[in-house]
Regions:
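Long, hydrophobic, amphipathic alpha-helical segments used as structural scaffolds
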Residues: 39, 62, 99-103, 133-144
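Single conserved hydrophobic/aromatic residue that forms the stacking wall/gate
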Residues: 1-9
């Protein structure tokens, strides 16, 4: 995956509702099931399944929908929440597809070029996204898109 795909319309329609954790997990599990079965998929499902394919360590988590919905992922147990992780991949893909904050598409593409891999670049961006979300939540202030973009740009251009 060397380029970012334009999923703008799809993501805007998804942004019009806030899915429950169970709905998010169901979406990922069903997208992965469709991929494995070779069934037709919506573009957003294809994008999700592409990111799941990049994470073989999570394939079992996506294989059993009922278990996925029931399972808890406590922050302190050291196990990453694969659904949160994949949701962050989709969020970053969305940000790039609509270039919001303005300039993120170029910054992520530049970081991917430096890394030689879009997936590795996404993981670096995730660290910034997670930190900025935590900062906003703890301070009670809105998410600072400019600081987020600045962090990505600094990482993309550092020697």
């Amino acid at each position: 995956r060397s380029t970012l795909f334009p999923y703008t319309t799809l993501f805007r329609s998804l942004a019009e509702f806030t899915p429950s954790p169970a709905e998010v997990r169901r979406f990922f599990c069903r997208a992965w099931a469709k991929r494995r079965a070779g069934q037709p998929m919506q573009p957003i499902e294809t994008l999700a399944a592409d990111w799941i394919a990049e994470h073989p360590e999570y394939h079992a988590d996506f294989a059993d929908e009922a278990s996925a919905i029931a399972r808890a992922y406590p922050e302190l147990d050291g196990q990453a929440n694969p659904f949160l992780h994949l949701a962050m991949h989709l969020s970053i893909s969305e940000q790039c597809s609509i270039d919001q904050p303005r300039g993120i598409r170029h910054a992520v593409e530049q970081l991917a070029s430096r890394q030689g891999d879009l997936h590795r670049a996404h993981h670096e961006v995730m660290a910034f996204l997670g930190q900025m979300l935590a900062d906003a939540q703890s301070s009670g202030r809105p998410f600072d898109g400019n600081a987020y973009l600045d962090a990505i740009q600094r990482r993309a251009t550092r020697d």
